[in-house]
Amino acid sequence: MAVISMKQLLEAGVHFGHQTRRWNPKMAKYIFTERNGIHVIDLQQTVKYADQAYDFMRDAAANDAVVLFVGTKKQAADAVAEEAVRSGQYFINHRWLGGTLTNWGTIQKRIARLKEIKRMEEDGTFEVLPKKEVALLNKQRARLEKFLGGIEDMPRIPDVMYVVDPHKEQIAVKEAKKLGIPVVAMVDTNTDPDDIDVIIPANDDAIRAVKLITAKLADAIIEGRQGEDAVAVEAEFAALETQADSIEEIVEVVEGDNA
């Protein structure tokens, strides 16, 4: 059984590609047709490649892989952060800083500075510093958190990188390739698929499409780490949360189901 159904893909608008004049000819084999000047992605292939991506991510996670989620455009930022956190992984959802992977030592120093500023606030150092200095430190922390907060606790260079829109994230993809890090990516009709190790032909501009694919890959990581049952349990709780706004109401729903 496919991890994502054709119906889910259609409802999320995964099939809508870019304008035909903006296409990359290397994506021709993943295109079903053209309609009103827009390429339509072949969802039968998306189903197949999504299955392959799921298996790849699940197996990597089962071997304790560190996964970095990357998506810096507004349509991807929220989903990338939410699903990385949900699956216990790491993310970059604002501008990619050149050298994030290839100059990891320097990035680690910036992360150490971020942690130092946080400690200063927690241990009371801020209380004895001049207000002007505290304001500057807070400004520095905010900037560091914006760009590095999602990888603050990443223990090492990632073993796998998941990318939403590799056309936009070309620098990130190049750094990953240079270091031999496999890249899993949503690939739209305007993108060169050759640099991607595990592709998912998909509309990477629609929020619902990005959320659907990204959430499914997060599920793969959870399954790889905790087993298939963990994904089912999490889905059950997610369904409960749509019915209840408080812990008390969730308990009532659960007890009602068991009555």
UniProtKB/Swiss-Prot annotation:
GO terms for biological process: translation. Keywords: Ribonucleoprotein, Ribosomal protein. InterPro entries: Ribosomal_uS2, Ribosomal_uS2_bac/mit/plastid, Ribosomal_uS2_CS, Ribosomal_uS2_flav_dom_sf. One of its GO terms (molecular function) is structural constituent of ribosome. The keyword Nuclease does not apply. It comes from the Bacteria. SUPFAM superfamilies: Ribosomal protein S2 (SSF52313). GO terms for cellular component: cytosolic small ribosomal subunit. Belongs to the universal ribosomal protein uS2 family. This is Small ribosomal subunit protein uS2.
